[in-house]
Curated annotation (Swiss-Prot):
This is Elongation factor Tu. Residues 81-84 are annotated as: G3. Residues 10-206 form the tr-type G domain. GO terms for cellular component: cytosol. Belongs to the TRAFAC class translation factor GTPase superfamily. Classic translation factor GTPase family. EF-Tu/EF-1A subfamily. SUPFAM superfamilies: EF-Tu/eEF-1alpha/eIF2-gamma C-terminal domain (SSF50465), P-loop containing nucleoside triphosphate hydrolases (SSF52540), Translation proteins (SSF50447). Mg(2+) binds at residue 26. Residues 136-139 are annotated as: G4. GTP binds at residues 19-26, 81-85, 136-139. NCBIfam families: EF-Tu (TIGR00485), PRK00049.1 (NF000766), PRK12735.1 (NF009372), PRK12736.1 (NF009373), small_GTP (TIGR00231). GTP hydrolase that promotes the GTP-dependent binding of aminoacyl-tRNA to the A-site of ribosomes during protein biosynthesis.
């Protein structure tokens, strides 16, 4: 039992299974935990323990998600699996489970199906950077040519959505056989090969602290004789005393200098990702900065008003709208710490959007917000959340 000892200093990578219903996502998830436990140590999780996914509430949205963990020799993986298609849509749009890479499970017996396509599209929209394919149920296909045909179809589908289809790793196997302990090529070795492929193909994610500094502003105070202090939680990067920073969003971008960082009334020489701090700004007046703006490393983020969004509209049961909305709908968009009104343009041919739907739409805000692709937001009406979305692509 010597291999039970976990190394907690390994890099953490977040992954998840995506793909059409009944193509074997949950079976593969269980097989991954079993194979990793047997080969490299750790704990296996049974199929039932994953399939009965607990419901969680993320921004008021009910999402059923299973979380499992497994280890390769060099990494610790946190893996999400969802029981239903609607759960995937909600999960990916809210960013409840941000993925560094996804495992697309496709049945070799059926080939790509509607949700295969939809999950690839969602991955593109919400910014999942890498996809690895597991061609499942390979034991049910005797004809090698048929396997190759399905592989080609999957590669074409990935390329359709700007993933590198020709270079995407595809592993053929049987998740069920692997889960049963089968040691033939398509059983446990195929799943082991999948994990080794994740190790090689998905790069180690950059830690928040190594990214360019960004802090959403929550509050603004003026301290007599010292100047203006803004408070908030540092989202990423580090701000050091003496560094030049920009104030971005709502108004024209301005430059200032950080002349002090405080945490719990103690003076620090820097504020780091994850910390709640007060930042003292040189020469900035109390009325020149407000909640909803961000402090950022100069040049690292710009303000925008127009973008394409992928949106999930809450159902009535989730406390959302009871009625559909139409083209020209003008709700508030809640970014980080503030609401901004925006107008929605629906895709051509879409008359209306019903509660419980997901939709791609064009949005134009009445004031610019510091944004980049992948930024999450809530849609609100009078302070009540009626939707969740992600910036798929900035247009202006």
């Amino acid at each position: 039992m010597a291999k039970e000892k976990f190394e907690r200093n390994k890099p953490h990578v977040n992954v998840g299974t995506i793909g059409h219903v009944d193509h074997g996502k949950t079976t593969l998830t269980a097989a991954l935990t079993r194979v990793c436990a047997e080969v490299w140590g750790g704990n296996a999780v049974a199929f039932d323990g994953i399939d009965n996914a607990p419901e969680e509430r993320e921004r008021g949205i009910t999402i059923a998600t299973s979380h499992v963990e497994y280890d390769s020799p060099t990494r610790h993986y946190a893996h999400v699996d969802c029981p239903g298609h609607a759960d995937y849509v909600k999960n990916m749009i809210t960013g409840a489970a941000q993925m560094d890479g996804a495992i697309l499970v496709c049945s070799a017996a059926d080939g790509p199906m509607p949700q295969t396509r939809e999950h690839i599209l969602l991955s593109r929209q919400v910014g999942v950077p890498y996809i690895v394919v597991f061609l499942n149920k390979a034991d049910m296909v005797d004809d090698e040519e048929l396997l190759e045909l399905v592989e080609m179809e999957v590669r074409e589908l990935l390329s359709d959505y700007d993933f590198p289809g020709d270079d995407t790793p595809i592993i053929k196997g049987s998740a069920l056989k692997a889960l049963e302990g089968d040691t033939s090529d398509i059983g446990m070795p195929a799943v082991q090969k999948l994990v080794e492929t994740l190790d090689e193909y998905i790069p180690e994610p950059e830690r928040a602290v190594d990214q360019p500094f960004l802090m959403p502003i929550e509050d603004v105070f003026s301290i007599s004789g010292r100047g203006t202090v803004v408070t908030g939680r540092v989202e990423r990067g580090i701000v050091k005393v003496g560094e030049e920073i920009e104030i971005v969003g709502i108004h024209d971008t301005t430059k200032t200098t950080c002349t002090g960082v405080e945490m719990f009334r103690k003076l620090l020489d820097e504020g780091r990702a994850g910390e709640n701090v007060g930042v003292l700004l040189r020469g900035t007046k109390r009325d020149e900065v407000e909640r909803g703006q961000v402090l950022a490393k100069p040049g690292s983020i710009n303000p925008h008003t127009k973008f394409v969004a992928e949106v999930y509209v809450l159902s009535k049961d989730e406390g959302g709208r009871h009625t559909p909305f139409f083209n020209g709908y003008r709700p508030q968009f809640y970014f980080r710490t503030t609401d901004v009104t925006g107008a929605c343009t629906l895709p051509e041919g879409t008359e209306m959007v019903m509660p419980g739907d997901n939709v791609q739409m064009d949005v134009e805000l009445i004031a610019p917000i510091a944004m980049e692709d992948g930024l999450r937001f809530a849609i609100r009406e009078g302070g009540r959340t009626v939707g969740a979305g992600v910036v798929a692509k900035i247009t202006e």
